[in-house]
Amino acid sequence: MPMIDADGCLLNVSVEGRDGGPTLMLSNSLGCTLQMWEPQMKALTQLFRVIRYDRRGHGKSGVPAGPYSMERFGRDVLTILDDLNIEKTHWCGLSMGGMVGQWLGANAPERLNKIILANTTSKGNCVNTIQNCNHGTDKVA
């Protein structure tokens, strides 16, 4: 798996599937790694060149000091696409990955073919969400 430098943060990226096929980029939910898509890979790689990545702060990617933003996450995706010489991709984002997809759709629509937004929202406060995850679910139990 290549490591791609996005403004000093190394991002863990996986590229699998059909060479020359249409590209599908998968973006996972908060707290998950690119491995969350493993059960779908056999089917998807028969049809697509599939790009998965660990968002900064996740998995094998770097963990630079925050705060992070949707713009930062979106620009990381554009860096990955540029580094892999991909002009356009289909996008599938789950939860937070869908939020990144919305940023891309609004700010770099020329880089996307189709967008799948799964179980997502149009806004959120990443810092508060991460802090809540760090404190656990005691408040909602």
Regions found by a protein language model. Give the residues of each.
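Catalytic nucleophile serine of serine hydrolases
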Residues: 61, 95, 119
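Conserved HGGG/HGGXW glycine-rich cap/lid loop of the alpha/beta-hydrolase fold
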Residues: 9-66
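Conserved alpha/beta-hydrolase "nucleophile elbow" surrounding the catalytic nucleophile
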Residues: 28-30, 89, 93-98
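Flexible "cap/lid" loop of the alpha/beta hydrolase fold
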Residues: 99-107, 112-141
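Short beta-strand immediately N-terminal to the catalytic nucleophile in serine-hydrolase-like folds
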Residues: 73, 91-93, 118
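N-terminal cap/lid segment of alpha/beta-hydrolase-fold proteins
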Residues: 1-10
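Residue in the alpha/beta-hydrolase core beta-strand immediately N-terminal to the catalytic nucleophile
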Residues: 54, 90, 113-116
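Conserved acidic catalytic loop of the alpha/beta-hydrolase fold
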Residues: 72-89
